[in-house]
Amino acid sequence: LYALLQKQSKEFHLKQYPVRIAMPVNLRRFFPSRTLRNFITMVYPSIDPRLGEYTFEEIITQVHHYMRYYINEKFLRGDITTNAATQRNPVIRIVPLFIKDIVVRTFYAKIQDKNSSAGLTNMGALKVPEEMKPYIERFDIYMGQPFSSRTNCAIISFEDVLTINFASSIVEADVERYFFRKLVQDGIHVKIESNRTDESAF
């Protein structure tokens, strides 16, 4: 959110827009399930710069309270109930699967993907058997390239290495640059690897 706000403030001086991140929530943490299918719902922490300038600390505070408010069993159960009711709809049930797939992909590309400024997924700390650790340097995880002009970010950690990967359909690397520069300013050691040909991107 900080990097998105920085990018927007530099590009649009007259009009500011809310920035919103799409984040999946693993529902297995709250509702144990043996399904191998994705069992997630989405939350959208956001900052509205039209209300005033936000410091980094204020962004952290707002996101913290948003997550505490929305990520709880009652809200999540409501999402599950809504989705289950849609699946049980008799009209939807008789629609062929290939048509459903087309509709879902179109909905995501035209609406869902554009409903947020960026996507973020955090796999957390990955654990492996002790005998495997000496052979592993790090893990990487990537989100697919978004349909719209936005940036996706995926985070995973192993031992003392935190890996943050970006995927974007935008030529410029402004969001990534603001993000990593903030980490460096805060005294965090950063090693950057990129497949971009412009070495000055960061």
Name each model feature, range by range.
Residues 1-2:
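Short amphipathic alpha-helical segments
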Residues 6-202:
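Acyl-thioester-dependent acyl-group transfer interface
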